[in-house]
A protein has these predicted regions:
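Signature of the first transmembrane helix
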Residues: 2, 21-86, 110-119, 148, ...
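Interhelical loop/hinge segments that connect adjacent transmembrane helices in multipass membrane
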Residues: 6-26, 138, 213-256, 296-312, ...
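Membrane-water interface segments that mark the loop-to-transmembrane alpha-helix transition
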Residues: 25-40, 66, 75-126, 136, ...
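Membrane-interface "helix-start" segments
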Residues: 29-32, 140-144, 170, 225-229, ...
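Helix-loop junctions and terminal segments of transmembrane helices
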Residues: 77-94, 164, 278, 282-322, ...
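Membrane-interface junctions at transmembrane-helix termini in multi-pass inner-membrane proteins
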Residues: 88, 150-173, 359-390, 431-435
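Interfacial segments at transmembrane-helix termini and the short loops linking adjacent helices
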Residues: 122-145, 315, 323, 332-363, ...
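Hydrophobic alpha-helical transmembrane segments
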Residues: 139-143, 172-221, 237, 279, ...
Length: 460
């Protein structure tokens, strides 16, 4: 096991101090995370294939509904506090034992509320999911999913604590354990218990991962803080800190639905299909790179106090991320029609031009992402919220104007780019003023030259 510092931070697997934040560390952290993510995705595909072959369309659809319920409850009831936990642990704002105690208390309280819903209200949840004609057939299954979502909530906090400790390999291993356990159990649960097995399967993998993750955290925690006192304060602490982030998650959903409604009103379902295809590809592209990096960048930034050291790390993170994203952005731009045809069909090739325009925003989005991690790691949630709300306002207002003036669906993609350009300017201003961050000449020149090259590739 790695040693724990007085602040509760665990040593990195490679080297301590600034070496840990070297370019080599970025490569190692990203390489391992993306490999684990690929394996986890592959195991998920295997699980879905087993469900589709031996369960058929009906059980596949049922599993999809149960997964939405499970994910919605566990993510929604976390109130965005997982980011707060990462910041607490990585910065030493609270000791590891205190953070574990507060998170444990919160999970216990929410678990109790979920138990009440599972016992007394599952029929109403089933009606909301399936309607009255089918609800009575799945009351028991819904109760199981509602109750098991407490395990999902606990796993969110386990992952957050380990992310705060920069335990990249441990987090990846837990995700692999969850995915492999689900894949191994899929055939037995689906063929033996049908719909009830589908309900069990949704949270099955997380049970195994939680056992391992909980055991690891228990070994890392020093001291024996009781989890029997201060329950109300624990909930108040987490919810008050994370409610703003939870509100932003809700805002993101509202923006997505609103923009889709505006596009549908202006360009019909065909236009919505093209816009959704391009947006899905561009957002997935960003997620594939940023999700693995987040487990390393966010907690490492949280452990940096002095602005010069923080600025050095931000510049290094930005340079590495740009070098990683840039060639892939050019490939996405050049192969967009092949990608669209492979993922969808020839009927969606009209989304190619939309995707090309949205690719222009990849470099600004990359810079913005790194600056956003710096703000979150410093606990500047209100500042982060201002930038997110500003971008959401531009997207909704801009799309409304585009549809009102009948400028064409391509203009929607340009609104997307404009929103991220404004977002970048705001993030830069806040980062300089509130964090005293300074992007060096190398980072600025790299971002500007890559933006220019992507633009030239688009125009050619």
């Amino acid at each position: 096991m790695h040693s724990v510092s007085p602040k509760g931070k665990v040593g990195d697997a490679s080297a301590p101090g600034f070496r840990r934040r070297s370019l080599t560390s970025f490569v190692q952290a990203f390489g391992f995370s993306i490999s684990a993510m690929t394996l986890t995705t592959g195991l998920g595909v295997i699980s879905n294939k087993i469900i589709a072959v031996w369960g058929g369309p009906e059980l596949s659809g049922l599993v999809a509904v149960f997964r939405q319920l499970y994910g919605g409850l566990s993510q929604g009831l976390s109130f965005g506090a997982d980011v707060v936990v990462v910041q607490w642990v990585s910065s030493g704002q609270k000791t590891l034992s205190t953070t574990v105690r507060i998170a444990s208390q919160y999970v216990l309280i929410i678990g109790g509320l979920l138990a009440v819903v599972a016992v007394f209200l599952p029929q109403w949840v089933a009606i909301g999911l399936f309607g009255r004609p089918l609800a009575s057939s799945y009351v028991l299954e819904v109760a199981v999913v509602v109750m098991s979502s407490a395990v999902g909530l606990a796993m969110i906090f386990v992952i957050a604590i380990l992310n705060g400790l920069v335990r990249v390999r441990t987090v990846a291993a837990l995700n692999i354990i969850a995915a492999s356990t689900t894949a191994a159990a899929a055939y037995l649960l689906i063929t033996r218990w049908a719909s009830f097995g589908a309900a069990l399967l949704v949270g099955f993998g997380n049970v195994a991962a939680l056992i391992v993750g909980g055991w690891l955290i228990r070994r890392l925690v020093s001291g024996g803080d009781s989890i029997r006192h201060g329950l109300v304060n624990a909930v108040r602490t987490l919810v008050s800190s994370g409610s703003l982030l939870a509100g932003l998650n809700i805002l993101a959903t509202v923006v997505l639905l609103t923009v889709q409604a505006i596009v549908t009103r202006g360009y019909g379902l065909e236009g919505l299909a093209l816009y959704s295809a391009s947006a899905t590809i561009s957002n997935t592209f960003m997620m594939l790179f940023m999700s693995p990096m987040k487990t390393y960048v966010l907690p490492t930034l949280g452990g940096l106090g002095a602005s010069p050291e923080r600025s050095r790390f931000v510049n290094r993170a930005l340079q590495f991320t740009l070098l990683l994203v840039f060639p892939c952005a050019l490939a996405l731009l050049g192969l967009r029609n092949v990608i669209i045809q492979g993922l969808y069909s020839t009927e969606f090739l009209g989304a190619g031009e939309l995707l090309a325009i949205e690719t222009l925003a990849i470099i600004p989005r990359t810079v913005t992402w790194v600056l956003a991690m710096a703000l979150l790691s410093a606990g500047l949630y209100k500042t982060y919220a201002v930038t997110e709300v500003t971008r959401a306002t531009i997207l909704i207002f801009g799309c409304g104007v585009v549809v009102a003036l009948q400028l064409g669906i391509h203009a929607v993609a340009w609104v997307f780019c404009a929103a991220y350009a404004v977002d970048l300017v705001i993030y830069l201003g806040y980062s300089i003023r509130q964090l005293q961050l300074r992007l060096n000449a190398a980072s600025t020149a790299l971002a500007a030259s890559m933006m220019l090259l992507v633009t030239l590739a688009y125009l050619s």
